[in-house]
Amino acid sequence: MKKFAMVFPGQGSQAVGMLADLANEYPVVTETFKQASEALGYDLWNLVQQGPAEELNKTWQTQPALLAASVAIFRVWKEKYPQLQPSVMAGHSLGEYSALVCAGVIDFKDAIKLVELRGKLMQQAVPEGTGAMYAIIGLDNDAIINACKQAEQGEVVSAVNFNSPGQVVIAGAKEAVERAAALCKEAGAKRALPLAVSVPSHCALMKPAAEQLAVTLEGITLNAPATPVLNNVDVKAETESAEIRTALIRQLYSPVRWTETVEKMAQDGVEVLVEIGPGKVLNGLTKRIVAELQATSVNDVTSLDAVEALLA
């Protein structure tokens, strides 16, 4: 069997109707959403299946929805392929919480409430319309970091997601981000695309949210991971609960080092990356980071059935 990693997507991968066909074949999907709904106090499965999209896209609802979707797919995987165990896990931003639940670190219901709170705190930290995020395509990291420094002028703007070589996301105060995006274009970026988000994640504007999240996180029991989980902030697999807590708090205002995460997996002998969650965002990034890695996304019956042959 090939050595494989499981990776879990973050916000942007959600879609109304996700997991519908898996739910028809595997009752554990709706059972998982029922547990999430009990923790939240509203019907999450109904929101995910019926929408509307503008409700699902509110960050405090997106985050529990994606966490529940990834955990549901993972539980289906464990039912169908108990013999197929990943050697390592990681998640992109919110996906780190999915990875920690699937690695046995955080109780599922605790995590659902935690990511709902994370979404609310993130939204409260920056009034809607005052922050922005742009994807910068086709410019090297150093040039982007320099553009952000030049654009600051006393405001927050920084590189926040190192997604793949030539794809970096910047975030911060709206005007500063727009200045930085223009400077990136001047420096030779192919494109600077505004992202449809209500919150500028992973920049210094999220520090107040992180401080409040820390208080709640302190009261949650964390277990030792059954599978190593590489974190976003240091690309390290922490085993002590204090370190895992600190990494989750820092994650809110620190860059997601995804390129390095995938490179580390490849260096450690991983041959296949399996994305557990809706969409194919991480699958697409993998091929741009390490071309020789195989990548697949498992989010419906067809992809679930096909994965065994890929890992053989």
What are these regions (language model features)?
Residues D234, Q294-A312:
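Short, flexible loop segments at boundaries between secondary-structure elements
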Residues T62-P64, P200, P255:
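Glycine-rich phosphate/pyrophosphate-binding beta-alpha loops
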Residues Q11-S13, A103-Y253:
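Alpha/beta catalytic cores of group-transfer enzymes, especially the acyltransferase/condensing modules
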Residues K2-I144, V272-T302:
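FabD-like malonyl-/acyl-CoA
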Residues K185, A266-G269:
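Non-catalytic positions within long, well-ordered alpha-helices that form the structural scaffold/packing
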Residues T259-E263:
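Short hydrophobic/charged patches on amphipathic alpha-helices used for structural packing
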Residues L195-S198, A266, N299:
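Short glycine-rich catalytic loops that host catalytic nucleophiles or stabilize transition states
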Residues A23-N24, Q150-E152, K185-A187, R288-A291, ...:
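Short, solvent-exposed amphipathic alpha-helical segments in soluble enzyme
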